[in-house]
């Protein structure tokens, strides 16, 4: 059990190091560029401006005000898209690094149970959580599963600590895959 605990701590340490490496790469390729800084400031400004306009608008607002808000939303959406495209080049570099490091560490931890899950994972996740492990105990956790979970959560927290995470206003306006859905029927 003590080797399992040591493996778990080592994987968390590896995740912290790879997350710091990823943020370092992103800083070099993206965050320090003038284009990124300009776009980020523009998105922040537009998000706050749009939020204020939406708060002050009433149901009986004229078509003119609604059109202005729609134009501003479109401009914000375009700037968010441009910001995502600027970040894209670092995503390729980070993806390459993570894949190489994951392959290397996966070969080190191959076939070793690194943690014991307090639950039985869903059947479609078991292929990842029990990858390359012998036995039928589905609560055994493989390196790859723990590494992915740690890296995802640690990287987000490192971004928040370093002040590199997108602001709440920009995230709220952008929507996206995990963001809130855009309000429907409000201005149409």
Swiss-Prot record:
Instruction: Please indicate which superkingdom the organism of origin belongs to.
Output: Eukaryota
- What's an example of a GO molecular-function annotation for this chain? calcium channel activity
Disulfide connectivity?
Answer: none
What protein name applies here?
Answer: Calcium load-activated calcium channel
Question: Which GO CC annotations does the UniProt entry carry?
Answer: cytoplasm; endoplasmic reticulum; endoplasmic reticulum membrane; Golgi membrane; mitochondrial membrane; mitochondrion; multi-pass translocon complex
**Of which family is this protein a member?**
Belongs to the TMCO1 family.
What assembly does the database describe for this protein? Homodimer and homotetramer. Homodimer under resting conditions; forms homotetramers following ER calcium overload. Component of the GET- and EMC-like (GEL) complex, composed of RAB5IF/OPTI and TMCO1. The GEL complex is part of the multi-pass translocon (MPT) complex, composed of three subcomplexes, the GEL complex (composed of RAB5IF/OPTI and TMCO1), the BOS complex (composed of NCLN/Nicalin, NOMO1 and TMEM147) and the PAT complex (composed of WDR83OS/Asterix and CCDC47). The MPT complex associates with the SEC61 complex.
Question: Which key words tag this protein in UniProt?
Answer: Calcium, Calcium channel, Calcium transport, Coiled coil, Endoplasmic reticulum, Golgi apparatus, Ion channel, Ion transport, Membrane, Mitochondrion, Phosphoprotein, Transmembrane, Transmembrane helix, Transport
| UniProt cross-references to PANTHER family, sorted A to Z | CALCIUM LOAD-ACTIVATED CALCIUM CHANNEL, PNAS-RELATED
Annotated membrane topology:
Multi-pass membrane protein
Instruction: Please list the residues that carry the modification Phosphoserine.
Output: 60, 188
Please give the residue ranges for the topological domain Cytoplasmic.
33-86, 163-188
User: Where do the TM regions start and end?
Assistant: 5-32, 87-106, 141-162
Entry annotated with the keyword NAD: no
Source organism:
Sus scrofa
Tell me which stretches of the chain form a coiled coil.
32-89
Intramembrane runs of residues: 121-130
């Amino acid at each position: 059990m003590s080797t399992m605990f040591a493996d778990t701590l080592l994987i968390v340490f590896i995740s912290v190091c790879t997350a710091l490496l990823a943020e370092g790469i992103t800083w070099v390729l993206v965050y320090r560029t003038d284009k990124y800084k300009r776009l980020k400031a523009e998105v922040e400004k537009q998000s706050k401006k749009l939020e204020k306009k939406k708060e002050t608008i009433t149901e009986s607002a004229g078509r003119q005000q609604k059109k202005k808000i729609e134009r501003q939303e479109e401009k914000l959406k375009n700037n968010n898209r441009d910001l995502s495209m600027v970040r894209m080049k670092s995503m390729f570099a980070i993806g390459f690094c993570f894949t190489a490091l994951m392959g290397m560490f996966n070969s080190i931890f191959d076939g070793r149970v690194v943690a014991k899950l307090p639950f039985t994972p869903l059947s479609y996740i078991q292929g990842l959580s029990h990858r390359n492990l012998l036995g039928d105990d589905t609560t055994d956790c493989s390196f790859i599963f723990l590494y992915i979970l740690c890296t995802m959560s640690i990287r987000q927290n490192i971004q928040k600590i370093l002040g590199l995470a997108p602001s709440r206003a920009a995230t709220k306006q952008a929507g996206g895959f995990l963001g809130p859905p855009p309000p429907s029927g409000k201005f149409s």
